Amino acid sequence: DRIWDLGMSGWEANRKSIISVTILFIGMVLAYAVVGLVLPQATLQEQYTFIMDRGTAYNSTDLSPERFAHGMTFLRINTYVLIVFFIFAFIYRGLGTSMALGWNAGVWAITLVTAVKVNMAAAASPILLALIATVALSPHVLLEGLAYLSGSLAAIFFSRGVTLYKPTDSRFFKVLNAVVVLAVVSFGMVILAAVVEHFWAPFMLGFL
C-alpha cells in the first residue's frame, strides 16, 4: 500500500516493511518463548503437537553440535518452506505473510525453549547454558524469518502487480524487477541461514 497508495519508492517501502515486520516477528518469538517457559513439558506436548511431533529435527531436545551441523538438510527444507509461503502470500497477501511469520516463530521458539529447559535440569550452570544456546541459535532463526518475510513481500508485490497492470505495461516490469530482487534476497538469506546453522551453531554449542 505504501507504493501503490502513497507513491513511496520501492526501496523505502521495502525497508520500512522489513523493519516493522521484523519487530513483529521478534515479538512473536518472544511471546512463544514465554509460553514455552511457563507451561510444563506435558502441556506443551499436548497443546503444541503440530510442533512437537514433526520429527526428530524438531522434537529432539539434543543441543549437541552434531544435531545442527546439517546445513544442506536445513537448506533443502527451508527452500521448500519458502516456496510454500510464497504461494500462500501470493494468494492471501498480508494474511499469508502473517501466517509465515507466526508459524516460523512458533516452531522455533517452542522447539528451542523446550530443548533448553530439558538440558538446564542437568546443566552445571543453567544460566550459561541458556545464554550459549540463545547466542548459537538466534542468528539462524532471525535469518530464516527475514528470508520468509522477503519471499512473502515478493509474492505480495507479484500478486498486486498482476492484478493492477497488464503484462505490456512498463509499471509491471518495475514490479517484476522488485519481485526478482526480493526473491533473490530471500533465497540468499535461506542459504546464509543454512551456513550459519551448519557452522556457527555447532561452534557455539561446543562450549556447553
Regions found by a protein language model. Name each.
Residues T22-V38, I91-G106, H140-L143, S186:
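Hydrophobic alpha-helical membrane-insertion segments
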Residues L112-F187, I191-L192:
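Hydrophobic alpha-helical transmembrane segments and adjacent short intramembrane/lumenal linkers
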Residues R2-A13, D169-K174:
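Membrane-interfacial, low-structure loops and terminal tails that flank and connect transmembrane helices
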Residues L82-I87, T134, I191, V195:
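Alpha-helical transmembrane segments of multipass membrane proteins
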Residues L192-L208:
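Juxtamembrane boundary at the C-terminal end of a transmembrane helix
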Residues E12-I77:
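Hydrophobic alpha-helical segments and helix pairs
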Residues S64-I110:
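Internal active-site segments that recognize and position negatively charged phosphoryl groups
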Residues S9-G27, G94-S98, L176-V184:
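Alpha-helical transmembrane segments and their helix-start/interface "positive-inside/aromatic belt" motifs
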